[in-house]
């Protein structure tokens, strides 16, 4: 992937692949994943369950507002919800095992460019059009960004770049930004 600009800028950057979750379910893993953070507000007010701004040490035990935890590796989730979490992913890869279909979706990316991955867990929590409470999917979104909070937050000081992880990149005219990612479907 190549990005070219016509004026100097400092911007967040990310990819937005989204995968459906089949009826037979799926298991998510992010090898090498380290600390993570829950979106700082309810993604879908009154529906989201994770603790806004909460820390995640393990994807299988994300803290909820009611004091319980939610396993984000076993999909679909057991409740209607919409969630965003950002995980440090220094290995630049994620796997989505879809056992009933006998496949694994393997995603790899340049972790030097995209040090984190945002997981968008859409689990029947949005009832407005076009989702209508039927959308069951996961976005596995490599980023150099502070969630999807925009340029001013990502390019400024924020809790993610305070940990030493870039949340924006500098782009210059005449100097293309080149990166790569790969999505593969593997038979089990």
Predicted feature locations:
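Short solvent-exposed strand-capping/beta-turn motif centered on an Asx-Ser/Thr pair
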Residues: 4-8, 186-188
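Short, hydrophobic/aromatic beta-strand segments
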Residues: 7-15
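Active-site pocket scaffolds in enzymes
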Residues: 105-188
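Short, well-ordered beta-strand segments enriched in hydrophobic/aromatic residues
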Residues: 1-5, 181
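Active-site/ligand-binding surface loops and adjacent short beta/alpha elements
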Residues: 18-21, 25-113
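A short, structural micro-pattern
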Residues: 11, 22, 132-134
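Short, flexible loop/turn elements at secondary-structure junctions
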Residues: 5, 17-19, 144
């Amino acid at each position: 992937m190549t990005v070219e600009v016509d004026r100097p800028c400092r911007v967040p950057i990310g990819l937005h692949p989204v995968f459906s979750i089949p009826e037979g379910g799926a298991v998510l893993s992010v090898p090498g994943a380290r600390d993570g953070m829950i979106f700082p507000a309810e993604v879908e007010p009154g529906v989201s369950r994770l603790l806004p701004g909460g820390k995640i040490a393990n994807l299988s035990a994300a803290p909820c507002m009611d004091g319980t935890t939610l396993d984000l590796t076993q999909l679909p989730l057991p409740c209607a919800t919409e969630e965003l979490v950002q995980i440090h992913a220094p290995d630049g890869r994620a796997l989505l095992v879809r056992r009933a279909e006998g496949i694994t979706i393997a995603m790899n990316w340049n972790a030097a460019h995209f040090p984190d991955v945002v997981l968008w867990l859409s689990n029947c929590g949005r009832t407005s059009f076009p989702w209508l409470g039927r959308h069951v999917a996961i976005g596995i979104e490599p980023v150099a960004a502070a969630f999807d909070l925009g340029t001013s937050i990502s390019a400024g000081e924020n809790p993610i770049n305070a940990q030493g992880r870039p949340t924006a990149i500098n782009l210059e005219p005449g100097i293309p930004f080149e990166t790569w990612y790969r999505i593969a479907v593997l038979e089990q």
